[in-house]
A protein has these predicted regions:
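Aromatic-glycine hotspot motif
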Residues: 1-134
Length: 135
């Protein structure tokens, strides 16, 4: 299987996005480090979707974005070429189903937190006020 990827970097850090697996990406200090993580990311993604994992894959860089942002913090400003075209009704339905599955999974995770007011994070203020520290 070939995984088409968009490589976003700032010369020091890398974000590598799997174009055909919405939301799947890896990070690394180098492109090579991010590529090494991609198979595990795709296998995890396929498992989440209820699909069979792949045993081998090739990575194809189909687009590159040089960024001025702090890639190490996962800041991003890339827009994939494949995202520029209008969505078909079928593409919209598939993306909507993924978003709803993600929301349902997040809600299940949130609901599993026994004490939503408990925190292990220290208090921290910004110029906007207190940073949230609980579920």
């Amino acid at each position: 299987m070939t995984i088409n990827c968009v490589w976003e970097h700032n010369g020091r850090d890398t974000l590598l996005y799997a174009v055909d697996f919405v939301g799947a990406y890896t990070r690394g200090e180098t492109l090579e480090a991010a590529v090494r993580k991609m198979q595990a990311e795709i296998c995890s993604y396929l498992k989440w979707c209820g699909k069979k994992a792949v045993t081998s894959m090739d990575i194809a860089i189909i687009e590159e974005k040089v960024s001025e942002l702090a890639i190490c913090d996962a800041d991003s400003d890339v827009l994939f070429e494949s995202e520029r075209a209008p969505l078909t009704a079928e593409e919209y339905k598939k993306l909507k189903a993924l978003a709803l599955k993600s929301a349902q999974d997040f809600l299940a995770l949130y609901d599993s937190v026994p004490d939503k007011n408990a925190t292990a994070a220290p208090e921290r203020k910004t110029f906007y006020g207190q940073v949230p520290r609980t579920a």
